[in-house]
Curated annotation (Swiss-Prot):
Cofactor(s) essential for the protein: Mg(2+); Mn(2+)
Name this protein carries in UniProt: Acyl-coenzyme A synthetase ACSM3, mitochondrial
Functional note: Catalyzes the activation of fatty acids by CoA to produce an acyl-CoA, the first step in fatty acid metabolism. Capable of activating medium-chain fatty acids with a preference for isobutyrate among fatty acids with 2-6 carbon atoms.
Originating gene: Acsm3
Localization annotation: Mitochondrion; Mitochondrion matrix
Natural source organism: Mus musculus
Tissue: Detected in kidney (at protein level). Detected in kidney proximal tubules and in liver. Detected at low levels in testis, stomach, heart and lung.
Annotated CDD domains: MACS_euk (cd05928)
KW Transit peptide (keyword) present: yes
Amino acid sequence: MVMLLRARCFQRLAIPDPMRVLYKDYRTATPQNFSNYESMKQDFKIEIPEYFNFAKDVLDQWTNMEKAGKRLSNPAFWWIDGNGEELRWSFEELGLLSRKFANILTEACSLQRGDRVMVILPKIPEWWLANVACLRTGTVLIPGTTQLTQKDILYRLQSSKAKCIITDDTLAPAVDAVAAKCENLHSKLIVSQHSREGWGNLKEMMKYASDSHTCVDTKHDEMMAIYFTSGTTGPPKMIGHTHSSFGLGLSVNGRFWLDLIASDVMWNTSDTGWAKSAWSSVFSPWTQGACVFAHYLPRFESTSILQTLSKFPITVFCSAPTAYRMLVQNDMSSYKFNSLKHCVSAGEPINPEVMEQWRKKTGLDIYEGYGQTETVLICGNFKGMKIKPGSMGKPSPAFDVKILDENGATLPPGQEGDIALQVLPERPFGLFTHYVDNPSKTASTLRGSFYITGDRGYMDEDGYFWFVARSDDIILSSGYRIGPFEVESALIEHPSIAESAVVSSPDPIRGEVVKAFIVLNPDYKSHDQEQLKKEIQEHVKKTTAPYKYPRKVEFIEELPKTVSGKVKRNELRKKEWVTT
């Protein structure tokens, strides 16, 4: 097996408080300030202990602090649904319930340390319990989005060799349809009010399970979770994360980008199948002792999101750019966000126009962050720093970020190249270990002493990084290199456009030209489309460099997206090049 890097191990730290694995001076009430960014980055260091388990070394320590009266009385977990149901857990209650769940995994399901558990659940409390139970037992969590089809589930079960699956009534039939083809699968748990043949009913089992359980003493570099990529350029690949790469690594997100303290209430709207849920719905807030807030909505409803932000004491809000684009289309004048103090976005670049609309309507900036399923936060806009709209910000304390050419040489400010992370001589702790069962893919990401992210960008004179495109999204037209994001940002400023995606399209003269696939706002669907195309093209010429305007425009009802919500530009691009 090709490993991306070999971690440098430290001896187990002889410290009285495991919290100090994460940082020297534990904060309960003092937010960060990045006005002195260079000093903050230079002083940051986390020593990785030989053994680390997030459930034992973080969550259980918060329980101890609760019992000692050293933590505020706000819940550790706060869940609501759309029907008026509400649930709150302290860290002590979270610990008790997760120990019961852990006993179900080890006793009823006969799972052992290192066995793999696929969890496909919506935003219900059992999803969080499953996460912590896997940590306690040393089993490997494999999250999946509830949008997976029967074919998707079969592929993931077979590829991962999962021995157990946990899901609900909606997807249980799909699992049953493929289970016979999955030779490693021997346990099925369902979250349901009803029994189902061949399945253990988790709700019933939780009633009788013991709450006495000894957490497995995991080494920091043991596999903790496997995440499937979105699969925008081929079949999904398995990304391996360890107890330190996420369990310790995501402390960077919580401490610096999210700027969380123990009194905060953090709401992240990401789907449970995304690594972003691990980022902002599990590790980052709980590292800081903050409350994880969750709202179970069967589908995204912008008015429900705004009502929740207004009604509940949410202080930190995280959502995808698409969500912000939908939210700002609402009349928000009747909503009051008295508790909200910090808003962040990640997953794809967010358009400056959307950031400005959000600021005008809420009085709050959106702090964009950049990372991958393979990493924790790579770059971010941090509190106290000047925000440059459209920029990914500056490197997080976890990484040394460079822009490289194809030979591995570092490029000067202003020149576009590959976004890369230095991995030698010392491995950064917030980075995945390898693509599981895919050594050639793992090896392909290395260029000298750097991990190549697969994204293109540049750094400006002030040290801010700017995203251009995925490497395979770059458009080469008449000698010009054009990234889709800048064109899409110009397009979204036109009032007729709800969403857009820009790809290359073949042209006999220029080789390639920019083509825009556009989803119109409802009020513009009856307009003359030829006239509207011309208006949009002229708008882009005036908004960005004229050579970047879309010479081809096609109006469509919806954009193709992955199960994690990212636009599948490769599908649109393939359509152009195969059919032309």
